[in-house]
Amino acid sequence: MRKIIHIDMDCYFAAVEMRDFPEYRGKPLAVGGSSDRRGVISTCSYEARKFGVRSAMATAYAFKLCPDLILVPGRMQVYKEVSLQIREIFSRYTPLIEPLSLDEAYLDVSECQQYKGSATLIAQAIRRDILAETGLTASAGIAPVKFLAKVASDLNKPNGQYVITPETLPDFVKTLSLRKIPGVGKVTAEKLSSLGLNTCGDVQAYSKPELLARFGKFGGVLIERSQGIDERGISADRERKSVGVETTLAKDIYSLEQCQQVMPGLIQELALRLSRSAKERKIHKQVVKLKFNDFKQTTIEHRSDEVSIVMFYDLLAQAMARQEGRGIRLLGISVGLADSILAVPEIPNAQTQLDLAL
């Protein structure tokens, strides 16, 4: 049985700011773009979260929830330098490290002999080292499989950890909400709920052939995850080829204008994900994807090392020309990443690599 640790830094960008600027401590603080440029919140302190402020939220709306919010621009170079420190700490315990972003990673410590091979003690040691050497706290989840380690890391935040052992896994999974399974978003969860499926235990008791008939390949994944099965290994040399975001719509939409109304939220989320990328790399294309209500899809791309919102809207219009009267059930945007590293100055906010000036 594998031993997987998921490390997640606690409100990372904001925590770095509070470490370096003590006057921010204990106050509602957010890192993100300014409201007058339609900025988005990258992350925020726990004090800000008490007011309902969240990552990926429009900055203007965050100020409505918390008028006393302190907003600071991101210092991406600093965040990257600290992330490298944290990565070096990971490497003391295992070479099998899969970074997900600057502030989280999977570690496979199955072969680690330190602390007599106890993943629980290894996670404690890693968190202790991070605090001692960076002044930042981290939370951890420990489990035999990746997705449950990630779920567990969120259960004892901040500055804590949660363990799912092989013995406790069956009972833990049985009551786990399906929303915790990767790929189950709001719309999919509603469809599952309409079938009486809300927890992994519900799926375990449901007809497997019917799930496969209704959800195809994803139905098979759902069956496995609901039993706590996740055979994915740690991709130690993983390098993302693209960064994207998509949304499955609650109801099919049919007009270009309706699709255009969905775009601002997608663009804000894409900007946030780009700002959290572990490396700055050249962008070589941008892409718009539509999935129709007959489950066929189309993609339109534009090759360029400069990305603009205007082009996203142009690509959307081109994709809609292929609609042929069908309803749109999913809309997505992404950028393709080249192998070489960017040699341009840092843009210190959540709009990194996106020209948000229409």
Curated annotation (Swiss-Prot):
It catalyses: DNA(n) + a 2'-deoxyribonucleoside 5'-triphosphate = DNA(n+1) + diphosphate. It is found in: Cytoplasm. Binds 2 magnesium ions per subunit. It comes from the Bacteria. CDD domains: PolY_Pol_IV_kappa (cd03586). GO terms for biological process: DNA-templated DNA replication; error-prone translesion synthesis; SOS response. Coiled coil: none annotated. The record marks F13 as: Substrate discrimination. Mg(2+) binds at D8, D103. The active site is at E104. Residues 4-185 form the UmuC domain. Keywords: Cytoplasm, DNA damage, DNA repair, DNA replication, DNA-binding, DNA-directed DNA polymerase, Magnesium, Metal-binding, Mutator protein, Nucleotidyltransferase, Transferase. It is an enzyme of class 2 (transferase). One of its GO terms (cellular component) is cytosol. Pfam families: IMS, IMS_C, IMS_HHH_1. Its cofactor is Mg(2+). Its EC number is 2.7.7.7. GO terms for molecular function: damaged DNA binding; DNA-directed DNA polymerase activity; magnesium ion binding. Belongs to the DNA polymerase type-Y family. This is DNA polymerase IV. The gene is dinB.
